[in-house]
């Protein structure tokens, strides 16, 4: 190893040692999270009014049936699978913010197959249903002197 390579590696090693030897400063929770929650007032200036609702619903059914007769003899197979998934999220801020979120899924399926030496029959059925509903409002402060 020549002298130039040795000096370069030595300098890199010293810089790495300096960087790793620094102490980590304590950070506030606000800085660590990278976000701060805004303060709201109840007098109207700076008050936050929002209502958010999301919902997702999905259903799936796979039904498969097979009946066959081949030289080795009759055979049959069937397969059925049903999946449902629902999720919802509700966010409400400020005065009188209301949100409701409902989600429902249903999946049903059946499959059957039968064979004899002379005939083969197969049947497959599937039903799915999904429903989602989101309702939300964020009422503003009523004006003085007005009655509803």
Curated annotation (Swiss-Prot):
Cellular component GO terms, alphabetical: apoplast
Family assignment from sequence similarity = Belongs to the UPF0540 family.
Query: Which region is the signal sequence?
Result: 1-21
The annotated region (Disordered) lies at 123-148
Transcription found in the keyword field: no
Please provide the record's keywords in A-Z order: Signal
One GO BP annotation here?
mucilage biosynthetic process
Q: Where is the composition biased (Low complexity)?
A: 123-132
Q: What is this protein called?
A: UPF0540 protein At1g62000
Question: In its keyword annotation, does this UniProt entry include Signal?
Answer: yes
